[in-house]
Amino acid sequence: MSQGSIVQCIGAVVDIHFPRDAMPKVYDALKLDASEANGMAEDGLTFEVQQQLGDGVVRTIAMGSSDGLRRGMKVNNTGAGISVPVGMGTLGRIMDVLGRPIDEAGPIDSTELRVIHQPAPKFDELSSSVDLLETGIKVIDLICPFAKGGKVGLFGGAGVGKTVNMMELINNIAKQHAGLSVFAGVGERTREGNDFYHEMKDSNVLDKVAMVFGQMNEPPGNRLRVALTGLTMAERFRDDGRDILFFVDNIYRYTLAGTEVSALLGRMPSAVGYQPTLAEEMGRLQERITSTKVGSITSIQAVYVPADDLTDPSPATTFLHLDSTVVLSRDIASLGIYPAVDPLDSTSRQLDPQVVGEEHYSVARAVQMNLQRYKELRDIIAILGMDELSPEDKLAVSRARKIQRFLSQPFHVAEVFTGSPGKFVSLKETIKGFKGICAGEYDHLPEQAFYMVGGIEEVIEKAKTL
């Protein structure tokens, strides 16, 4: 085990000098020598090698606070990458980027360690599935259905409901789904991690979830690697032949941490100040989130959209890797329709008559057609009013407004705020309801009856009280 010494420290980037014949490899983990404990620097602080500068000097990223570091401190090379505990011992526990417990419940009961940098599965090991994953959320099941073993992105700007949607999906899928889940909190608020933990605990599914957090207050090195730590744990369960759910909140913060690290490493920024290696970093993470012939990983990722601009390089790079995209819209949220999913912008590869069936496909397209027609007529209505429309257009607008309201739904996780009990709507019920609206079976009901309800039966009941 070779030993080196710190020669330069700029924020989270630390340069360490080693003997020329014992230079660490890129991605090797280095540890601060125990003799350097001075009450200021973090005990056993880990560094990850990013670049070899030559002449025995390596440039590293500190996986923790670099406060208290000074030149000349001794650092040991572990000779391997960052390794984290994997397996059943991680379930029900909260860990940091290095796999250390942060829930004050004693050490992790796992003897097996795995390096966080792994190659993606080979092409001949991959498997594709066309089974649908029912979420119980009407707009998602109808317009952008999820595939088992697929990748889903929840796109949205600040405050349109990404995390609430993610929590509802966890609530509906993880609780129904008998398998295991891994949750990676990447650069999000600590409060959200705390809420998630208690939500899981109260619903007795904590023993089926492994949680890894690298929150907003952590150094960029932690936020950059925490997604890989969570993924490594999920891969281990998948390789045991299980079907895993992998939740990431938020992929954008992973990119942002990469931008910070890239700037500190002195790389030239590319478009909008992002790192030049953006596509490669995203690909390295996303290509590992996949299903093999042994087991599957279904991943649901929240993606923050800076300034509501979907063409920003970060969300645009993420789009390429996904099977379903759920786009949350500020315009829809401002109408008070939640979940604020934009049915005209959201897409899914599964929405194909050969996968979902002819009926589902035609109902989904009819819903989109009605909403698109309403969107086109909105300017005319704003200027001339409803009276100037032809009878056919009036009918189309009336149905579209009912569809728009029927796409809203009370969530279980938002019960505390809304006071109305959450609803899980089966796919069969969803298709039946929208098919009826498009066919004009409910033209006589007032549009208020369609707002914030579950199935179509509830609409009929609600209409009686209005």
Curated annotation (Swiss-Prot):
Purpose of the protein: Produces ATP from ADP in the presence of a proton gradient across the membrane. The catalytic sites are hosted primarily by the beta subunits.
Its Enzyme Commission number? 7.1.2.2
The organism is Dechloromonas aromatica (strain RCB)
Keyword flag Ion transport: yes
Which superkingdom?
Bacteria
- Assembly and partners? F-type ATPases have 2 components, CF(1) - the catalytic core - and CF(0) - the membrane proton channel. CF(1) has five subunits: alpha(3), beta(3), gamma(1), delta(1), epsilon(1). CF(0) has three main subunits: a(1), b(2) and c(9-12). The alpha and beta chains form an alternating ring which encloses part of the gamma chain. CF(1) is attached to CF(0) by a central stalk formed by the gamma and epsilon chains, while a peripheral stalk is formed by the delta and b chains.
Question: What is the recorded name of this protein?
Answer: ATP synthase subunit beta
SUPFAM superfamilies, A to Z: C-terminal domain of alpha and beta subunits of F1 ATP synthase, N-terminal domain of alpha and beta subunits of F1 ATP synthase, P-loop containing nucleoside triphosphate hydrolases
- Top-level class of the enzyme under EC nomenclature: translocase
Q: Does the keyword Hydrolase apply?
A: no
Q: Where in the cell is it found?
A: Cell inner membrane
Q: Quick one: a GO cellular component term?
A: plasma membrane
List UniProt keywords, sorted A-Z: ATP synthesis, ATP-binding, Cell inner membrane, Cell membrane, CF(1), Hydrogen ion transport, Ion transport, Membrane, Nucleotide-binding, Translocase, Transport
GO molecular function: any one? ATP binding
Tell me which CDD domains the record gives: ATP-synt_F1_beta_C, ATP-synt_F1_beta_N, F1-ATPase_beta_CD
Write down the chemical reaction(s) this protein catalyses.
Answer: ATP + H2O + 4 H(+)(in) = ADP + phosphate + 5 H(+)(out)
How the protein sits in the membrane? Peripheral membrane protein
Q: What Pfam families does the entry give?
A: ATP-synt_ab, ATP-synt_ab_N, ATP-synt_VA_C
Output the InterPro entries linked to this UniProt entry. Answer: AAA+_ATPase, ATP-synt_VA_C, ATP_synth_F1_bsu, ATPase_a/bsu_AS, ATPase_alpha/beta_chains, ATPase_F1/V1/A1_a/bsu_N, ATPase_F1/V1/A1_a/bsu_N_sf, ATPase_F1/V1/A1_a/bsu_nucl-bd
Q: Which residues bind ATP?
A: G156, G157, A158, G159, V160, G161, K162, T163
- Print the organism lineage: Bacteria, Pseudomonadati, Pseudomonadota, Betaproteobacteria, Rhodocyclales
Q: What family does this belong to?
A: Belongs to the ATPase alpha/beta chains family.
Q: Where does this chain mainly localize?
A: membrane
PANTHER family (alphabetical): ATP SYNTHASE, ATP SYNTHASE SUBUNIT BETA, MITOCHONDRIAL
